Amino acid sequence: SGSCTTKTCWTTLPKFRELGYILKDKYNEAVQVEPVRASRNKRPTFLKIKKPLSYRKPMDTDLVYIEKSPNYCEEDPVTGSVGTQGRMCNKTAQQSNGCDLMCCGRGYNTHQYSRVWQCNCKF
């Protein structure tokens, strides 16, 4: 007559919002690099930091990038982005259609609209 104790361990991911904050911080700290070839016909053998402000080799968990991301706030015929200028936005929304986010900090004009329609109401 003995007793048996079982322990089970597992790894879980952090909450999705926490993960988003971590990725956003890593994105903001990302460093631009350029591939360097040892010879003309070989694949790149290492990445060089493009604008070294202070020398710190990126760690395996850091984000690096080769090309800058396009600015979707401005019109860019090369990428096909029409920009956000002149688009309607929702002043009170916190999502992607909200004015603060969509207008990229440029400010926005507000307009008040009135709409009249037939409601077929009976009193």
Swiss-Prot record:
Annotated region described as Disordered linker, given as residue ranges: 33-61
Subcellular locations according to the entry: Secreted, Extracellular space, Extracellular matrix; Secreted
An annotated Gene Ontology molecular function: frizzled binding
UniProt keyword list: Developmental protein, Disulfide bond, Extracellular matrix, Glycoprotein, Lipoprotein, Secreted, Wnt signaling pathway
Modified how: Palmitoleoylation is required for efficient binding to frizzled receptors. Depalmitoleoylation leads to Wnt signaling pathway inhibition.
Positions where lipid (O-palmitoleoyl serine) attaches: 1
Disulphides: 89-104
Gene Ontology CC: extracellular space
Pfam families the UniProt entry points to: wnt
Domain of life assignment: Eukaryota
Main location: secreted
Assembly mode: Forms a soluble 1:1 complex with AFM; this prevents oligomerization and is required for prolonged biological activity. The complex with AFM may represent the physiological form in body fluids. Interacts with FZD5. Interacts with PORCN.
Function: Ligand for members of the frizzled family of seven transmembrane receptors that functions in the canonical Wnt/beta-catenin signaling pathway. Plays an important role in embryonic development, including dorsal versus ventral patterning during limb development, skeleton development and urogenital tract development. Required for central nervous system (CNS) angiogenesis and blood-brain barrier regulation.
This protein's name: Protein Wnt-7a
Species, as recorded: Meleagris gallopavo
Lineage: Eukaryota, Metazoa, Chordata, Craniata, Vertebrata
